[in-house]
């Protein structure tokens, strides 16, 4: 039993990095990076809370060398969003980038949680 | 008169029998350990329950222990944005063998060691960066893991009335990826 326990590897059930982006000004497109990871994910998820008075576009890109591949794009309509969730299958270990674009005149703020798992 | 002598004798015998009653060979202990966690450094109370079997006139103990710990620690705001608290949970299970160094029925100084299996669930703030003018990206890490390892233990117990004792103890656990945790605690135990 002792040998069995001591010989055990740590058992990882989940290990995910995630990012919470607070956006208060939309004067220029906002870009936020999430570094690559060692293990392969299975999906990409975005969760949005907040209020905007104009539509805002959310995009996620996979950065592979000099190339940006779109992974997920969604347009948030004007209004209040509570736990609006977007999910996409995603299997790459590459670095990824979140881009938030809106009209410079947009008023409001968004809190965006995004992660791959 | 004979009856009175008989009654006194019976009472004396009863007292003598009570005085020589066996101390239980099992014990249950409840306690709290001030427990340190791996980086980012954190210390908090871990509530512990333990069952023990006593051997060789109380000089050797084999114990099984379970514990629970939950911490929520605030972080400094970054550019006025709260990055959220660090939430850390531990469910612990330990099996320990302890040997008593003092040949005294009311005092015990025990040293020992054993195996540990701890479950950890962490949601931790890793850092933040400014994005553009007034925007902030907060990096966090969420992890659930089962870690195994070993521990060393030292404890002092005072049996203040038959079958009841209080103790203080120090422990160090090495839990591989979860690092080294040290624990300083007190508890009360009952033998049965």
Predicted regions and their residues:
Chain A
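Post-signal peptide N-terminal segment of mature Sec-exported envelope proteins
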Residues: 16-38
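An anionic, turn-rich surface loop/hairpin at beta-sheet edges
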Residues: 66-91
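Edge beta-strands of jelly-roll/beta-sandwich modules across compartments, strongly enriched
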Residues: 53-58, 104-116
